[in-house]
Regions:
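Active-site/ligand-binding-proximal alpha/beta "capping" segment
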Residues: 168, 182-183
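Acidic, glycine-centered active-site loop in nucleotide-sugar glycosyltransferases
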Residues: 186-187, 192-195
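A generic "structured core" feature
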Residues: 156, 174-176, 180, 188
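Flexible, glycine/small-residue-enriched loop-and-beta-strand segment within the central core
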Residues: 87-97, 102-168, 194-209
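Single conserved hydrophobic/aromatic residue that forms the stacking wall/gate
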Residues: 1-16
């Protein structure tokens, strides 16, 4: 049985156990469902999903969306950033979203491994940011490990793209629609495809190819 339940050690112990699990996720260590406190983690994830579901149900004003996002992230969403529901998110506290961002509808963020979104980032509809992977060993496949995603300033991610664990997308890069991003993307480049491959550099208006 889960130690949080069987010992009845209360909220302080629960927070300590959950902190340990989250730190393991963020540091890339393996996390097993058999670990003490794992049930507490699942409860917290479901609490986040509950808030996200409330936000996603029916029309919400921009002010209401900001209120819900503040609860999900555990910190205020920048006033200059726009999020269009529905947004599907499992855990928001390890997620940071910068200023002037625009996040379109039907995106999915798996945040346990950590997501950092810079300023003025455009994220198209149905984009998936996935920071968690499973142990490839079939005997231990229920165990997971996290790898952070970092999206630098002024990135544009096209519709229906997926960014996989551990990827950094450099300043000003463009991810073509429908791409699967499996490795780091250099600044000021366009990538596209599955897996995403280099297409071209982005030149400023006064520059020539």
């Amino acid at each position: 049985r889960d130690l949080v339940r069987s010992r009845g050690l209360g909220d302080v112990y629960k927070r300590q156990i959950m902190k340990s699990i989250f730190e393991k996720d963020l540091s890339g260590e393996m996390v097993s469902p058999n670990e003490p406190g794992y049930n507490a983690l699942i409860e917290d994830i479901f609490a986040t999903i509950k808030v996200a579901t409330e936000m996603n149900t029916g029309y919400r004003t921009p002010e209401e969306v900001h209120g819900y996002m503040g609860k999900i992230l555990g910190k205020p969403l920048e006033e200059s950033t726009t999020v269009l529901p529905p947004l599907y998110i499992d855990y928001g506290k390890p997620i940071t979203i910068g200023k002037g961002c625009f996040i379109q509808q039907c995106c999915t963020f798996f945040g346990c491994g950590g997501i950092t979104i810079g300023d003025e980032v455009f994220i198209g509809p149905k984009v998936n940011l996935i920071t968690i992977n499973h142990d490839p060993d079939p005997e231990n496949r229920s165990a997971t490990y996290g790898r952070p995603i970092t999206i630098e300033d002024k990135v544009w991610i096209g519709i229906n793209s997926t960014v996989l664990p551990g990827v950094r997308i450099g300043y000003g890069a463009i991810i073509g629609a429908g791409s699967v991003v499996t490795k780091d993307v250099p600044p000021m480049t366009v990538v596209a495809g599955n897996p995403a491959r280099f297409i071209k550099k982005i030149n400023k208006p006064h520059q020539k190819d």
